[in-house]
Amino acid sequence: MLRYAVIACAALVVFAGALEFSDCGSKTGKFTRVAIEGCDTTKAECILKRNTTVSFSIDFALAEEATAVKTVVHGKVLGIEMPFPLANPDACVDSGLKCPLEKDESYRYTATLPVLRSYPKVSVLVKWELQDQDGADIICVEIPAKIQ
């Protein structure tokens, strides 16, 4: 019996630190998978190293057609949301998406994110949104991260 208790406790320790991506208000879609290059999903936060570029993808299913898709990114530090400017916010260009997006289909959005040397070494909750032509969130994903 003690052996099973030890195994259960060890499993809780492993899963307690596992990285979780959470939905932050998806309206017309649902993300099914998030993959971040070099991210250790056994940790509570994804480590983003300064002066590198991170590649990632989000798989999602769409419940309504979208004629245009815009990427909006914020970083939340100490409860304060700060916008993250993107060189190309048009998610229909160079991101694996071809607009218009059809309803009841699945898609993979891909992006690269520069982690600049000037960024402070801090824990941040990255809020990644894909918005439709009306500004409604198709998907909204929160990614716990730590800049090092």
UniProtKB/Swiss-Prot annotation:
The keyword Zinc is annotated on this UniProt entry: no
Entry protein name: NPC intracellular cholesterol transporter 2 homolog a
Glycan attachment sites: N51
SMART domains (alphabetical): ML
GO biological process: ecdysteroid biosynthetic process; intracellular cholesterol transport; positive regulation of defense response to bacterium; sterol homeostasis; sterol transport; synaptic target recognition
Cleaved signal peptide residues: 1-16
UniProt note: phenotype after gene disruption: Abnormal sterol distribution in many cells, also lower than normal ecdysteroid levels. Npc2a and Npc2b double mutants undergo apoptotic neurodegeneration.
Tissues and organs where the protein is expressed, per its UniProt entry: Broadly expressed with a higher level of expression in many tissues, including midgut, salivary gland and ventral nerve cord.
Entry's Gene Ontology molecular function annotations: cholesterol binding; cholesterol transfer activity; lipid antigen binding; lipopolysaccharide binding; lipoteichoic acid binding; peptidoglycan binding; sterol binding
Cysteine-cysteine disulfides: C24-C140, C39-C46, C92-C99
Gene3D superfamilies, sorted: 2.60.40.770
Subcellular location: Secreted
Function: Functions redundantly with Npc2b in regulating sterol homeostasis and ecdysteroid biosynthesis, probably by controlling the availability of sterol substrate.
Any one GO cellular component localisation term in the record: extracellular space
Species for this entry: Drosophila melanogaster
UniProt keyword annotations, A-Z: Disulfide bond, Glycoprotein, Lipid biosynthesis, Lipid metabolism, Secreted, Signal, Steroid biosynthesis
Primary location: secreted
PANTHER family reported in the protein's UniProt record: LP08842P-RELATED (PTHR11306:SF56), NIEMANN PICK TYPE C2 PROTEIN NPC2-RELATED (PTHR11306)
Keyword Signal: yes
SUPFAM superfamilies in UniProt: E set domains
Similarity comment: Belongs to the NPC2 family.
